[in-house]
Regions:
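Cell-envelope/extracellular polymer assembly enzymes that use nucleotide-activated donors
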Residues: 6-10, 41
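Short, acidic, metal-binding catalytic loop of nucleotide-sugar glycosyltransferases
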Residues: 27-39
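Short beta-strand/loop segment that forms part of the nucleotide-sugar
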Residues: 39-50, 69-71
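Glycine-rich, basic loop-to-helix element that forms the pyrophosphate-binding segment
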Residues: 71-88
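Acidic donor-diphosphate engagement hotspot in glycosyltransferases and nucleotidyltransferases
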Residues: 81, 102-107
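Short aromatic/hydrophobic "clamp" motif used to bind/position activated sugar donors
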Residues: 93
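The conserved acidic donor/metal-binding loop of glycosyltransferases
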Residues: 97-101
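Conserved donor NDP-sugar-binding/catalytic core segment of glycosyltransferases
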Residues: 105-119
Length: 119
């Protein structure tokens, strides 16, 4: 584990076969980047889907520290989240889905909470 005041964001994805996937995914990633240095890494655990893999591998994460993990088993949200936590390097994690966005102040007070709850 690294700095105890950083957060790993876990993003499990089952499929890209949603009509608005690319737009949702882009907005989600931008909302993560807007959190600043508090987010140390983005861990994407995605299902073995060629369309999804093509999109993720061609996406410009623009300097965001990204770990990619292909989930080969039957899609299972909880197992994908657990795998993301296993390979994350921060003491703190946050979960987001591809069709969600963090508000610009989502992690604003996180440093205060991390100071209080060090363990």
């Amino acid at each position: 584990m690294e700095n105890n005041k950083t957060i790993s964001v876990i993003l499990p994805i089952k499929t890209a076969r949603s009509a608005d996937f690319e737009d949702f995914f882009d907005r989600c990633i931008k909302s993560i980047k807007n959190q600043g240095e508090t987010v140390s890494e983005l861990v994407i655990v995605y299902c073995d889907d060629s369309l999804l893999e093509t999109h993720i591998n061609s996406y410009d994460f623009d300097g965001l520290n990204v770990k990619l993990e292909v989930w080969k088993d039957e899609p299972n949200f909880a197992n994908q989240v657990n795998r993301g936590v296993e390979i994350s390097t921060s003491n703190w994690v946050s979960l987001i889905e591809f069709d969600d966005e963090y508000s610009n102040i989502w992690f604003k007070n996180s440093q205060k909470y991390m100071d209080i709850y060090k363990d």
